[in-house]
Regions:
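Flexible, glycine/threonine- and acidic-rich loop/arm segments that mediate assembly and lattice contacts
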Residues: 1-222
């Protein structure tokens, strides 16, 4: 049967932050060794904290409704990918990897992104050495390196992510996952009180993930 009933999936937006920055008038004008200007330096640190929180939530976020005593949180890849989950294998092999690729192909999909941490990247590199067709150095950003592999199921980009657990590997297609923004990452000035300047850094985003049966993950690797 090629007809598949549509299933409505939902997600919540999550507020990342607000992270406050508060500096006195004295701190604003004095010089500090190694820092040209303290205020933009502190703002940049908070922006980076929010960006890292977003990256982590896109993978490991768990859906939580905004109720009394609970903070509304978004679901990440780990919440959406539920069909092709290998929760028994402790070592990823070429055969297991291709089995997952084939399962997605048989379901009508294709995988062109595999998200891995440092240890599993080395394991995959060992058995895919002959499949490497390109290394895109321009995509190195916040610890990510892109390596394109060729297999029976097409080209797949291996994305190295420093925030992934050793146990996990995720496979999906780039047209399945999209980051949706309700409020972009921003710096909001706060009311000045006394001899100080204040601001907060925040963003509000969520993950839209479609056709989860066209993706896979390993969850018990060591």
């Amino acid at each position: 049967n090629r007809t598949v009933d549509r299933v409505a999936r939902s997600n919540y937006t999550q507020i990342f932050g607000p992270h406050a920055v508060n500096m006195s008038g004295t701190e604003l004008v004095i010089s500090k060794y190694g820092v040209k200007a303290e205020w933009p330096y502190q703002l940049a640190k908070r922006v980076k904290e929010v960006a890292i929180s977003i990256e982590q939530a896109l993978v490991y976020g768990k859906v939580q409704e905004d109720t009394s005593g609970e903070v509304r949180t978004m679901g990440g890849l780990i919440d959406f990918i539920t069909t092709n989950v290998n929760s028994s294998s402790t070592t990823i092999t070429e055969a297991l990897w291709l089995d997952q690729m084939q399962a997605v192909f048989s379901a009508g999909g294709s995988v062109d992104r595999i998200l891995v941490g440092a240890k599993q990247k080395r394991v995959i590199s060992a058995f895919t050495a002959g499949l490497t067709v390109n290394v895109n150095l321009s995509d190195r950003k916040r610890g990510q390196v892109v390596e394109v592999l060729q297999s029976d199921f097409g080209q797949t980009s291996i994305l190295l992510d420093r925030w992934l657990r050793v146990s996990d590997v995720f496979g999906f297609s780039r047209d399945q996952a999209e980051v949706k923004t309700l409020r972009p990452l921003q710096v909001e000035p706060l009311a000045k009180t006394g001899d100080s300047v204040k601001a907060q850094v925040l963003a509000e985003k969520t993950l839209q993930f479609e056709r989860q049966s066209h993706s896979f993950r390993f969850s018990a690797l060591t």
